[in-house]
């Protein structure tokens, strides 16, 4: 009897160990499944750089922050006061963090900042076509856009340049006498080597430089002012090698001051 009881107890313990081992074996598989699900999380659908489109999330709906900022810009435009509009992505939006410098340099123009972080050419084109230039006839638009397109593989150099061209056309359709101060896309990344984003920006700049007509479109490349002699980008100017800090914005202000004054007469 004792022998049978011992056998039964042994079998029970063996079953528990087996089940425990099976549970432990399941954990890595479950963890791996979680990682796989996370890795396969949906992303926002790709968009052509030269066709107007709002910024959307993975669900295909317009990004709420983008929509809110756009609506605020539409209201500013309705006032019809701004003689100069800065239009672009986070590098343009970054002027909001340099209010004293912005006021000092651009209050005389009643300047408006229409920069939105993360914007690409298609987003700026959509904004122009959807109210941001209704009721406003600025003397000058300072336009720089495209680095966020260059930072991804979705858009070709030609497509990005076409997107910029379409933005200029859309502006002039709404306010024909406005002059566009078209800034070359700023350099990005540490240096020239192994830097596809900078290489792509340079290629786009080579195309958009040809948009310059000396009348309504004025191409202006100030990129070299941010670079050291060896072509590297100092973190003292762009800490993340993409966005300007106060020193960087001062460099930009100094670089465009004379040209902007000339165009805004």
PLM region spans:
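Second-shell loop/turn segments in exported
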Residues: 111-114, 150-157, 192-195, 238-243
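Structural recognition of the beta-strand scaffold that forms the well-ordered cores
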Residues: 83-88, 110-115, 139-145, 179-184, ...
């Amino acid at each position: 009897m004792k022998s049978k009881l011992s056998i039964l107890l042994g079998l029970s313990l063996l079953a528990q160990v087996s089940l425990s081992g099976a549970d432990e074996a399941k954990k890595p598989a479950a963890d791996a499944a979680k990682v796989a699900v996370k890795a396969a999380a949906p992303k926002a659908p790709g968009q052509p750089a030269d066709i107007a489109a709002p910024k959307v999330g993975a669900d295909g709906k317009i990004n709420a922050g983008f929509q809110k900022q756009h609506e605020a810009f539409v209201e500013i435009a309705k006032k019809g006061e701004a003689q100069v509009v800065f239009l672009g992505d986070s590098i343009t939006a970054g002027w909001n963090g340099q209010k004293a410098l912005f006021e000092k340099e651009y209050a005389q123009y009643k300047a408006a900042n229409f920069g939105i972080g993360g914007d690409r050419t298609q987003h700026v084109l959509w904004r122009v076509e959807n109210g941001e230039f209704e009721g406003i006839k600025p003397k000058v638009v300072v336009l720089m856009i495209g680095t966020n397109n260059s930072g991804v593989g979705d858009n070709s150099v030609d497509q990005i340049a076409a997107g910029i061209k379409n933005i200029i056309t859309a502006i002039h359709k709404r306010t024909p006498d406005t002059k566009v101060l078209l800034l070359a896309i700023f350099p990005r990344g540490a240096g020239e080597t192994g830097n596809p984003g900078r290489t792509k920006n340079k290629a786009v700049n080579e195309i958009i430089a040809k948009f310059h007509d000396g009348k309504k479109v004025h191409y202006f490349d100030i990129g070299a002012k941010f670079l050291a002699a060896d072509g590297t980008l100092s973190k003292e100017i762009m800490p993340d090698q993409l966005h300007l800090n106060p020193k960087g914005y001062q460099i930009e202000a100094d670089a465009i001051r004379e040209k902007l004054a000339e165009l805004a007469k």
